[in-house]
Amino acid sequence: MADAEDIQPLVCDNGTGMVKAGFAGDDAPRAVFPSIVGRPRHTGVMVGMGQKDAYVGDEAQSKRGILTLKYPIEHGIVSNWDDMEKIWHHTFYNELRVAPEEHPVLLTEAPLNPKANREKMTQIMFETFNTPAMYVAIQAVLSLYASGRTTGIVLDSGDGVSHTVPIYEGYALPHAILRLDLAGRDLTDYLMKILTERGYSFTTTAEREIVRDMKEKLSYIALDYDQEMETAKTSSSVEKSYELPDGQVITIGAERFRCPEVLFQPSFIGMEAAGIHETTYNSIMKCDVDIRKDLYGNIVLSGGTTMFPGIADRMSKEITALAPSSMKIKVVAPPERKYSVWIGGSILASLSTFQQMWIAKAEYDESGPSIVHRKCF
């Protein structure tokens, strides 16, 4: 009998921007690396350097100057399965150093994902990696678990997609889930664009990573956008400097809050969509009138794009303006929200009551990939 340590389930949250992976029962992911596959732009001239045909994650990131970087996941949906397989392979063998055929694997997916997508995930886990068991869970539901609630509305905003998912007593309400294809990567692109107006040019995939870092370190959300713009015009209090990898120092001011303002005003990037506050409100309004009060009182933020300072206050202000005046509104922004999907997965996969929920290899062999729709909902 293998001891329990050997058969710890693996939890892998495949985000558009970052993969978060580790062992069920841990309180944080062991491996966090970019969901990038890089291929050399030039053929190697140095003999014996042992060039690879593809690099994954941090290694691709560190060699980005000579690589073309591709993200296999776009807007939360896997668009390139060969590259995705490389990422999973890297996760299991290089990052976690485990044999996937010895561990059950819990994967995550965005809500409203195409059915074919989860079937393909299931197929790859069982046929390529020979896992003994697997499960696919919806990201936002896991975030709510991690916050210790069973009822609430989760605004999950990552690198590729944002969505609002109302959950009542542990069940997601699919008719009220709203998806917004506006997230961290669009903010990075917008920051690249507005920095160009300042005379700084960022164009390549490698330079995009620099701008992403700048966004993460310097951006914040204004409580009152117009007032903040006025302040920025008259004083230099919002200006901050940032050092580029080559030592050049650039200054950014109003761009710091103009960039994430797109979340509330998607028209900035030419999108005809409601902002995250309005999407959250619309999502609540699609729910039964009796449960709305519970949702307004438990608005939970999750994902890396909710890490901007000032987001909870602004969200609270905007939703208060939309909701009935007597309604008590509470926006919860847990400090670990960058990883709350993974943490929720870690909690779920280690529950004794969850153990009968896994899809076993035998069940897969009998029913094929479509079993995922019956067992994971």
From Swiss-Prot:
EC number: 3.6.4.-
Catalysed transformations (reactions): ATP + H2O = ADP + phosphate + H(+)
Other facts: There are at least eight actin genes in rice.
Location(s) in or outside the cell: Cytoplasm, Cytoskeleton
Cellular component annotations (GO), alphabetically ordered: cytoplasm; cytoskeleton
Keywords annotated in UniProt: ATP-binding, Cytoplasm, Cytoskeleton, Hydrolase, Nucleotide-binding
GO MF annotation, one: ATP binding
The organism's taxonomic lineage, starting at the top: Eukaryota, Viridiplantae, Streptophyta, Embryophyta, Tracheophyta
Keyword Translocase tagged: no
Protein name per its UniProtKB record: Actin-1
Function of the molecule: Actins are highly conserved proteins that are involved in various types of cell motility and are ubiquitously expressed in all eukaryotic cells. Essential component of cell cytoskeleton; plays an important role in cytoplasmic streaming, cell shape determination, cell division, organelle movement and extension growth.
Pfam families: Actin
PANTHER family xrefs: ACTIN (PTHR11937)
Organism: Oryza sativa subsp. indica (Rice)
Family: Belongs to the actin family.
Keyword Repeat: no
Record gene name: ACT1
